[in-house]
Every structure is written in C-alpha cells, then in structure tokens.
C-alpha cells in the first residue's frame, strides 16, 4: 500500500440477497488549506456500525469466506422477506465506522 492509499471496511448488500464484507484500498483525500489529514491507528466497531456491517437481516449460519489477503470477502445470505426494507443500499459498497483515534 502506498502513502497515497488507505484501507476501509466495506459492506455491500447485493441484489441476489447477500451481504459482502471486504476491506477496500481507497485513495487518501488531499486536504485543503484549512484542513488536516490525520493517521488513524485504531478505530472501534460500535453497535451502530454492526447494523450497517452485518444488517439485522443477515443469516450468520450461512457465512462464507473467499479469497485471501486484501482480496478476502466474507459473505452471508439475507432473509428474503427483509430485502425490501433494505432496497436503498442495494449494490452499494458502503464504508463502515466513522470514529477513530489518530496521531
């Protein structure tokens, strides 16, 4: 990973009824004149983050892990009767967590 990139936990609800959890390499933002960029060394996963990460509808008995290293993806099935409630996030890879501790 270069100094221009960072890592993000992502959660994606696919149209075929799966939640996919992955770690994405993303480009670090370039701060404006009145902004700073901090290095995050630790970040918790709070209960509110788990709602986005796993969703209330995930069937944890269907967990599947594929790939390796930075290409690892964890997936699980979603209860089909609850898919309608989650339509707004279909096929969108969303970052999880917004708190952290940095230097």
PLM regions: where:
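Short structural boundary motif marking the start of a folded domain
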Residues: 2-9
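Short beta-strand or tight-loop elements
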Residues: 4, 22-24, 100
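Residue-level signal for short segments within beta-strands and strand-turn junctions
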Residues: 10-13, 54
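Proline/serine/threonine-rich low-complexity linkers at boundaries of modular beta-sandwich domains
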Residues: 15-17
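Residues that act as N-cap/strand-start positions at coil-to-secondary-structure junctions
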Residues: 20-23, 88
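Glycine-rich beta-strand-centered segment in the early N-terminal region that forms part
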Residues: 29-43, 58-103
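Cytochrome P450 core scaffold surrounding the K-helix E-X-X-R motif
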Residues: 48-53
């Amino acid at each position: 990973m270069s100094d221009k990139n960072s890592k993000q936990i992502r959660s994606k609800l696919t149209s075929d009824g799966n939640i996919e959890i992955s770690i994405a390499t993303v480009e670090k933002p370039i701060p404006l004149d009145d902004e700073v960029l901090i290095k995050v060394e630790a970040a918790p996963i709070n209960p509110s983050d788990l709602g986005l990460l796993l969703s209330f509808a995930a069937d944890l008995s269907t967990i599947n892990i594929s790939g390796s290293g930075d290409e690892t993806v964890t997936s699980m099935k979603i209860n089909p009767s609850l898919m309608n409630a989650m339509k707004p996030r279909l096929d969108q890879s969303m970052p999880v967590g917004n708190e952290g501790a940095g230097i």
